[in-house]
Each structure stands twice: as C-alpha cells, then as structure tokens.
C-alpha cells in the first residue's frame, strides 16, 4: 500500500474565547491541523483522528523537508489502508497545551509578552473536544462519519460521543479506558515528580533560563515507556542480554553504567523524548489523563453516563496491554450494552502491550478496515 506522500500542516486561528473546564478562558488561540483525502460534497465522509500523549496532528505522510518524519499512524491512514484516504477525509488536530504548534505553554502569553510556561491553564479531554468541534465547524462538518483514537485518543473519541452525540456517527475507541486506575495515576505522578524535581525546571519558567529539564523528562519517558510494553515483549526484545557484543556472563562492569540492553534502550528513548518534547506539556497532558472520568458526574455509574449517546461503537483492546487492560474496554462495552447501543468489541491477541495500537498487526488492521467498509457504505464513500 502506498503512502499518502508529502503533507503539510496548517494553522487555524480562533478569536472566540474558549472557556475551559477549570473556569479559565483562552482567547485568540490557534490549533495546528493536517488533513488527508477529500471532503465530499455532502461533507459526510469526515473522520477525526485524535492523538495520544506524545503524538500530534501529524497522523500520516511525510514532510517535504524531512523524509524520516513519518506520521505516527501512517500504517493505519492512507490510500488503501484501513482508514482509506481515497474514501474518507481525515483530520488530525494538535491539542491545546501541546508543543507542536497549537497554543500551549511554549506560546507567547499576550498579557506578558513571554511564554506561558506554568501559567498555561490546565486543560482536560473535554476541553480538547470542544476545541476540536470548532475545527469541525470551520470545515462545515456537522457530523463526523467517525471519531477515532487509541489510548488517550480513544478517551477523546468516547468524550466526543458524550459531548456531541448528534455529531458522531461512529466512535472507534482502541486500547483505551473510561478512567485511569489508581495505579495509572500513580505512574503519572511519579513521572511528573521527576520533572518537577529537576533543578532545571525553574517552576515551569525554564524557557527564560535557556535550559530544559532534560533529566526529569528522560526519567518520565522511561517510566511511561515501560508501561507501554508487555513483559513478554520486553523479554523477547531484550531478555537479560548485556550491552557487550559477546554477551559473556562474566562481562559485568561492576558499576552503575549501562549494563543491560534494556537499560540502553530506555535511556535512548528518554534522550530522544527530551530532545523534542516539552516538560510543561507533559505535565498538562498527564493531568488531563488523570481527570478524565465521564462517570464521575453520575456517581461513578458509566452506564448512566453513556445513556444519551447515539453513536455506533467499535471498541478494541489487546491481550497484553496492562496499562489500559482489556477489562477497561469491557467496562465501556458493558455500559453501552446496558443502554442497548450498537457496539462491536474485539480483544486482539497481540504480544506488544499498550503500544500494539500503533503497530501493523494484520488481525487488528483487518478489523478496522472491515469496520470502515461498513461506514463507507453508510456515507456513500
């Protein structure tokens, strides 16, 4: 299957203030967007793809100035791919608070003329959805054929079906959860603590000091990355292999430098992440994850929370995902069935843990492809 090829983002400016769930108000904000495919005359073939923690609007394709800049879901979105851009008009939106061009902590605060830094207001999944709805309005899209996402993106897809039930025909929720467990909140807290305790954090105003809390970001990413992989996958990739080429059991250095391949891998992932991601953004997005809990307003009753939804659903989980385990997806399915909603559920046997939603797995992709075939028939795409 061919790639979608060279793509380019564009920036959308919004003058109407956006009131956030916290009560703060953002005015004159911008969102970076990428689109793929063509919007049909009826504007009925639009699909919104929502991104996870460290991703962005760049869902598919490559940038002309960097042939290595492949979109984060390029194996899923493109001509002839499960989400076929020959049939659907796909939108990727970089969320508020991110560090890839949309208004966030790195943006200039018009009140001070300096970056917002830690002054940028806390945002929630619901805030992102309301901002995305304004993007849809700008395109003249009254109803999405589907809203789709994995992990945190799946939470946004679910929130869309709750907040805008008339505007979502299908919700595709992959490797997600209706709320974070105490363990997941704990992982996020440890990661945030690594950043907050970095001497280069400077209370979030490190931009003015010309530094970056790299050490904290590195540790935060290492913690997170462990939770994205399964134990079996890590055993297969690394086992107890030493970094030394001969792998000799007597090749220990007897110090605290890197000894094992898995240590080297985690440090590499941490360094790479610290190069391109922003610490304040990491704090914001992990807190948005913590706060997401649509059942909270219904005394913890998810069935009651989903009672007014109107979309049809595809919910998928992966057997070795322990970050957002299949049981969490089954909670969503049960709540939908309690309300007699149309829902398809698949629990995919895959060894790759939470990150499986990003990988090219034939069973997984065939499932998504078949579901989009159904949507295409409905909208005449």
Swiss-Prot record:
The active site is at residues 151, 321, 354. Transfers a succinyl group from succinyl-CoA to L-homoserine, forming succinyl-L-homoserine. One of its GO terms (biological process) is methionine biosynthetic process. NCBIfam families: homoserO_Ac_trn, PRK00175.1. It is found in: Cytoplasm. Homodimer. GO terms for molecular function: homoserine O-acetyltransferase activity; homoserine O-succinyltransferase activity. PANTHER family: HOMOSERINE O-ACETYLTRANSFERASE (PTHR32268:SF11). Belongs to the AB hydrolase superfamily. MetX family. The record marks 323 as: Important for acyl-CoA specificity. Its EC number is 2.3.1.46. Substrate binds at residues 221, 355. GO terms for cellular component: cytoplasm. It catalyses: L-homoserine + succinyl-CoA = O-succinyl-L-homoserine + CoA. Pathway: Amino-acid biosynthesis; L-methionine biosynthesis via de novo pathway; O-succinyl-L-homoserine from L-homoserine: step 1/1. Keywords: Acyltransferase, Amino-acid biosynthesis, Cytoplasm, Methionine biosynthesis, Transferase. This is Homoserine O-succinyltransferase. InterPro entries: AB_hydrolase_1 (IPR000073), AB_hydrolase_fold (IPR029058), HAT_MetX-like (IPR008220). Residues 45-360 form the AB hydrolase-1 domain.
């Amino acid at each position: 299957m061919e790639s979608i090829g060279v793509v380019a983002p564009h920036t959308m400016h919004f003058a109407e203030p956006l009131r956030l769930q916290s009560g703060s108000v953002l005015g004159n904000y911008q969102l970076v967007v990428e689109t793929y495919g063509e919007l049909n005359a009826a504007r009925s073939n639009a699909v919104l793809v929502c991104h996870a923690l460290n991703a962005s609007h760049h869902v598919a394709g490559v940038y002309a100035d960097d042939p290595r800049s492949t979109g984060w879901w390029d194996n899923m979105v493109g001509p002839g791919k499960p989400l076929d851009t020959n049939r659907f008009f796909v939108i990727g939106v970089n969320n508020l608070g991110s560090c890839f061009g949309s208004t966030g902590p790195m943006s200039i605060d018009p009140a001070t003329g300096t970056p917002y830094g830690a002054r940028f207001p806390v945002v929630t999944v619901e805030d992102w959805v309301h901002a995305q709805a304004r993007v849809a309005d700008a395109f003249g899209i009254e109803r999405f054929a589907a809203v789709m996402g994995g992990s945190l993106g799946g939470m946004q897809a679910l929130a869309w079906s709750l907040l805008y039930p008339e505007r979502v025909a299908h919700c595709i929720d992959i490797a997600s959860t209706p709320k974070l467990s105490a363990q997941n909140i704990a992982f996020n807290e440890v990661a945030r603590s690594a950043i907050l305790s970095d001497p280069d954090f400077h209370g979030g105003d490190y931009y003015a000091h010309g530094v970056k809390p790299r050490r904290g970001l590195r540790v935060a990413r290492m913690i997170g990355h462990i939770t994205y992989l399964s134990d079996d996958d890590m055993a297969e990739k690394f086992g107890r292999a030493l970094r030394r080429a001969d792998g000799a059991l007597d090749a220990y250095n007897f110090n605290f430098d890197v000894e094992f391949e898995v240590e080297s891998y985690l440090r590499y992932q941490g360094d790479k992440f610290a190069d391109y991601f922003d610490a304040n953004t990491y704090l914001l997005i992990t807190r948005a994850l913590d706060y997401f809990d649509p059942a909270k307003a219904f005394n913890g009753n998810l069935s009651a929370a989903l009672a007014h939804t109107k979309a049809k659903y595809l919910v998928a989980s992966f057997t070795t995902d322990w970050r957002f385990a299949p049981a969490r997806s089954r909670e969503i399915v049960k709540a939908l069935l309690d309300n007699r909603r149309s829902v398809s559920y698949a629990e995919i046997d895959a060894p790759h843990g939470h990150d499986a939603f990003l990988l090219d797995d034939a069973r997984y992709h065939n499932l998504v492809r078949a579901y989009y075939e159904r949507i295409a028939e409905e909208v005449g795409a």
